[in-house]
C-alpha cells in the first residue's frame, strides 16, 4: 500500500488537530457537572455515556495524519484505564495541554530533545511530591472516592463502600445487570484467579474486551489439550443442549484451540479456554478448589481419567463467568455452600500442620479465595442506555477505590496538581533554557483539569484557577464554593493522579520530538458502474460465493471426529 508522508511543522500541526478533536470530545465529561456524549451504534439504540475512554475509542477521523494524533491520545486513555482503571479524562486533558504548549515552543525554535528532558524531570519531581502528599485510606474515604469517581453519585459510593466492607478491599467485586430497576448488592459464592482467555477470539464483549457467559459449564483438567479428538464427545453433547462451556486446563493449544475458535466464531458453540492457575501441585489444588466451588470433577492424570469419557455430570456449573485478558472471575451457584465450607475447614487443618511460611501464605490465599465470596453489584435503570452508563460509572468507582487502597488519596478536583505546580518553579531555575521551558510546559498544563472542571460547572475557568491559588483551597464544583477538598470528602486516588500525569507526559513528550508522520494513503472508492451497464449486474458475481461451499472442505476437520460441528 502506498504511503503519505508529512514532515516538520506540517506533521506536528496535523497531529495536534487530531489530538484536539478527540480531547475536545472527551473533556466535556470531566467533573461532577460533566456533560454526556451520545454515541451512535451500528445496531440498536445509541449509547449516552460519561466515560472518557469509551468516547475516545469511538473516534475515527477522515484525515489520516489527524487520525494518528487522535490514536496517540486514545493510547493515553487506554493505558491509564488499564493500569489505574480511572483517570482517563484527566490524562487526556493533561496530554492535550502539554501537546499544545510543547508544539508551540518547537515552532518557536526550541530544541525538542531538551524540551522532552525538561518535561521528564518535571514529572519525576511531581511523582515524588505526590507520594509525600498522599494519605492512607481510612474512615469514610472509600465511600468518598467512589462517589467522586462516579460523578458525585452518592448511591454508587455507598454501594461500592458496602461491597468492600463485605468482601474486603482485596475481595472479588463484580458488576452485572439487574432484572429490576433497583441497584442492589448481593454476596455469593465465587472466586477469581489471575489467568485469562487462551485466545482473544473468545471475546464476547468487544467494548470491554471480555468473554462472559451466564449459566456456563466448566471442564476442569490438569492435562494439556492439543488434539481435538479429546473434546469431540463433550462438545457434540453440549452443541445439542446449547450450554456455554469454559475449559480450564494446563494448556489448550494447536488443533484443539483452533477448532474451538472456529466453532465459537461460527456460532456453533459458546465456548472459551482458560489456562489453569498456579503451577505443579498448587495447580492441582487450585483446580480441586474450583471443582468444589462449582460441583465439578477434575479430569486428572493421577486418577487415570480421560477426556474422551467425560460426561456432563463431570462438569462444574456457574451462575456467571467473566474472563478478561489476564483474569477470570467465577460467580458460583449457592447449592455447593456446604462442600465449600468443608473444603475451607480441610485447608485450615492443613494450615495448622505446616511450618513453612511460604506454604502458610499460599494456603491462606486459597482460604481467602474460597471463603471470601464474590460481591455482585446488580445495576438497575429504567432504560438500557442509562443502565450501560450507570454500569460504566460503577466500574470506574470500583477501580478508583482499589487504586486508593493501593497508594492512598489526595485532594480531588484537579486541586492537587494545581498546587504542586508551584514547586516546579525552583526546578526550572536550575536548568538550561529549553529544559526550563520543558518544565514550564508541564507546569502550565497542570491547571488544565481544574480549569475544565470549572468550565463544565458553568464557571469562568481562569477566574476559578486564580481563586484556588489565592485562597490555597480547592473548588467544589457541586456547590460552586472554595473549601478544603480533603475535609469536604472530594478525593482522588493517588495512583490515578500519578498514572494520568505520567501517561500524559509520556505521549506529549514523544509528540514534541516527532519530525515525520507516515500514514496509509486512502484507497479511492471503487467506480459505481463497475458491474457493467446494470448497477445490480455486479451482484451476479456474488454467485461465485458458492465457491465458499468449498469451505465445507473444512469438513475435512470431520476426519478429526467433528463432522456435525463444522
Curated annotation (Swiss-Prot):
Residues 529-540 have a biased composition (Gly residues). It catalyses: ATP + H2O + a folded polypeptide = ADP + phosphate + an unfolded polypeptide. Residues 520-540 are annotated as: Disordered. It is found in: Cytoplasm. GO terms for molecular function: ATP binding; ATP-dependent protein folding chaperone; isomerase activity; unfolded protein binding. GO terms for biological process: protein refolding. It is an enzyme of class 5 (isomerase). PROSITE patterns: CHAPERONINS_CPN60. ATP binds at residues 29-32, 86-90, 413, 492. GO terms for cellular component: cytoplasm. Its main location: cytoplasm. Keywords: ATP-binding, Chaperone, Cytoplasm, Isomerase, Nucleotide-binding. Its EC number is 5.6.1.7. NCBIfam families: GroEL, PRK00013.1, PRK12849.1, PRK12850.1, PRK12851.1. Belongs to the chaperonin (HSP60) family. Together with its co-chaperonin GroES, plays an essential role in assisting protein folding. The GroEL-GroES system forms a nano-cage that allows encapsulation of the non-native substrate proteins and provides a physical environment optimized to promote and accelerate protein folding. Forms a cylinder of 14 subunits composed of two heptameric rings stacked back-to-back. Interacts with the co-chaperonin GroES. This is Chaperonin GroEL 1. It comes from Prochlorococcus marinus (strain MIT 9313).
